Amino acid sequence: MLWLADVLSLLGDQLARVALAVLVFGRTGSALLTGLVYALSFLPALVGGPLLAGLADRLPRRRLMVSCDLARGLVVAVMAAPGAPLWLLCALLVGAVLLTAPFTAARAALLPDVLPDDRYVLASAINNITDQGAQVLGFAVGGGLAAVLGSSMTLGIDAATFVASALLLQLGLAHRPAPSDPKEGTGRPSALRSALAGSRLIGGDARLRALLGYAWLCGFSVVPEGLAAPYAAAEGAGAGTVGLLMAAQPTGAVLGAVLLARFVAPARRLRLMGPLAVLSCAPLLGCALRPGIPITLALLAVSGLGTAFQLAANAAFVQAVPAAVRGQVFGLAQAGIITVQGAAILLAGAVASRLAPALVVAGAGGLGTAAAARLIWSLSRAERAAAQRAGLPG
């Protein structure tokens, strides 16, 4: 039920993103405003992640997830009202994203308890595949729904997915008490103290920092998704093509996750993170040639194939964190992921108001490739240092 509820929520999220991108670009014709509103589906996590993710370590995780789903369903239902002004849509979007932080943290913290040991790694692979599959379906179908039904109806469908997710979690997931940390005694730390403690844990471990850096590479590979509407418009295509452009990378990511989970031994996955991280960004350089929609879709699919490195990085990161603080630490990591995605899309939208969207996508690919090369070196250095401290050969 945890898996199915997550698929429903994610599917609804992608429907909403396509609907909002089409709605804003249709009203304004502005790549900057489209990027700004799309970025609002990521940026509030800068606050919500650090301060609200700790709720997943202080409250029963199932109850927290159900409450967040119901609240998000209500917020998105209001967004679906026809003719809602853009400022109201933006404000409601911020509220919905803030509620995503504790939900995501609770889900990530709960999964290793439901499926411990090696089953967690397999579950991570399945989740990665199904999450990307839900993105493909959500983006591809979302473009068609937005074109046929309109943005308001598409947002209404999104609200229904949150309610369905809440029902599945309440009826199909066993209750578990809130986790406890022996170091904290019977009391609970404040949200600020919890966030600071999680930050210190990450900051004090070079390997965790390097793994987190890999996770944050998505800030470069997400740029084509955020610029899909102006990119399609620059190529003379319509709303249906927007959905295809958004779906291309998740399609490649599904294939990459299947190949990595099925044919690569666990010990080799970490060694492949670097090359795959480079692959997630380097193909975007080809967009500088403005090769047309079909070749662009192929380049984006190859980029998505490379993002399979996130599977190994996520499993290694979560398993290295104590269970009692897993929600907070994962929330901090997720906040960073969402924040860099939103900031990258916002910056890309601003630049795309002056340059061709294809050139902006290519620039993101070049910067991401350089960052991936740096992370290969950083993780290798952290692992050598850890081996030396343990008295093992480097």
Where in the sequence are the language-model features?
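Alpha-helical transmembrane-bundle signature of multi-pass membrane transport and export proteins
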Residues: 1-394
